[in-house]
A protein has these predicted regions:
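N-terminal, non-cleaved signal-anchor transmembrane helix
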Residues: 1-44, 170
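Hydrophobic alpha-helical transmembrane segments
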Residues: 9-14, 41, 48-49, 70-74, ...
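Hydrophobic core segments of alpha-helical transmembrane domains in multi-pass membrane transport
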Residues: 12-25, 55, 128-134, 179-191, ...
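Cytosolic-side transmembrane-helix boundaries in multi-pass membrane proteins
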Residues: 1-22, 207, 214-221, 291-324
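Helix-loop-helix "hairpin" substructures at the membrane interface of multi-pass membrane proteins
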Residues: 89-97, 103-108, 112, 170-247
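Transmembrane helix-bundle core of multi-pass membrane transporters
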Residues: 120-196, 222-225, 245-250, 300
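Single transmembrane alpha-helix segments in multi-pass membrane proteins
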Residues: 20-26, 34-86, 110-117, 262-278, ...
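Transmembrane alpha-helical segments in multi-pass inner-membrane proteins
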Residues: 227-228, 233-234, 244-310
């Protein structure tokens, strides 16, 4: 396990260095060497990185979670509904959203562990269900405090303090709060995988489920835990997304799962399960973040970025299969 993680980390770091070299080479107007570029990249990739934290746990169990983007959208809308429309306290709204995300994840995990439904099918169903829930509770409309001015611009009135905090910057306006939340999620996952018994269970289930069961590992509970944590991290990302947009949009989060999966696999976590680590996911997030920033600086459109993301996922899977 340790040897695999070290070799995967080396390959992930090589990929990151290669992307940084591309940034230095294709450096439109010197933008890549400005701190604002790196700060904005960290802020942008943090939401995807939080999603990838939960996905890492799921993928190590040899599973997959296609619902992360929709769960982000659902919890973002729920947060806006509770905070902006119903004007509930953050002490009620935040735990409610986190619990809703974790519950949805546990439902997916239960379908997989107890009813033997394939992860792809179970999480695909949850993806559709969560998107429907987002549209249902919002009436298909954005939930916002935005007021349209006569000049065509928007004024955001009565923004709750929790929205302002999640959308703020600290340390002299250099680090976004969402970036610190991403780093905290990385730390939590590291503790789970490296210091807790459940972390060993997650690796055991992904490595050989039947052997883990015969060894006394609670396989079903481990899977439900992994998917429940994935749903929890989706909710964390949803809160951050709603705060950044100052609204709850039922369409937000579409295709986010692609970027989150790309982050995990480019870091080196094996899609077949049993191998990987949260440190690899952090490196993968930096790699994808810088790659997207380089493409943006050089005026590559969203279509090109999506195609590249798909190619990265396929390439990483083929590389893992070749090594195996």
């Amino acid at each position: 396990m340790t040897i695999h993680l070290r070799s995967s980390a080396v390959r992930a770091l090589i990929a990151l260095i290669f992307v940084l070299a591309l940034g230095a080479l294709f450096n439109a107007e010197g933008a890549f060497f400005k701190w604002d570029t790196h700060r904005d990249m960290l802020r942008h990739i943090s939401v995807f990185g939080i999603l990838a934290c939960g996905l890492t746990l799921v993928i190590i169990t040899a599973g997959i979670d296609l619902s992360v983007g929709s769960l982000l959208g659902f919890t973002a809308v729920l947060f806006a509904l509770l905070s902006l429309r119903l004007e509930l306290s953050a002490w009620l709204a935040v735990p409610a959203c986190l619990a809703a995300g974790a519950l949805c994840g546990c439902v997916s995990g239960g379908l997989i562990a107890k009813f033997r439904i394939q992860p792809f099918i179970a999480t695909l169903a949850m993806m559709v269900f969560a998107r429907g829930m987002a549209k249902s509770i919002s009436g298909g409309q954005k939930i916002t405090t935005a007021i349209l001015r006569p000049d065509g611009t928007y004024h955001y009135a009565d923004v709750p303090g929790v929205f302002a905090f999640l959308n703020s910057k600290i340390l002299g306006q250099n680090i976004a709060v969402v970036t610190l939340i991403f780093l905290l999620c990385i730390l939590v996952c590291w503790i789970i995988l490296s210091r807790l018994r459940w972390g060993r269970y997650i690796y055991a289930v992904g490595g050989n489920e039947e052997a883990a069961r015969l060894s006394g590992v609670p396989v079903a509970a481990t899977k439900i835990l992994a998917y429940g944590l994935s749903g929890f991290f989706c909710a964390v990302a949803g809160l951050c997304q709603a705060a950044q947009e100052l609204q709850g949009d039922p369409e937000t989060g579409i295709s986010y799962e692609l970027t989150a999966i790309a982050i995990v696999v480019i870091g080196g976590t094996n899609l077949m399960g049993g191998r990987g680590g949260i440190g690899l996911t952090f490196i993968g997030a930096m790699t994808i973040g810088y790659l997207e920033k380089i493409l943006s600086i050089n005026a590559v459109g969203e279509a090109g970025r999506l195609m590249l993301t798909g190619a990265i996922i396929v390439g990483a899977v083929l590389f893992q299969k070749y090594r195996k």
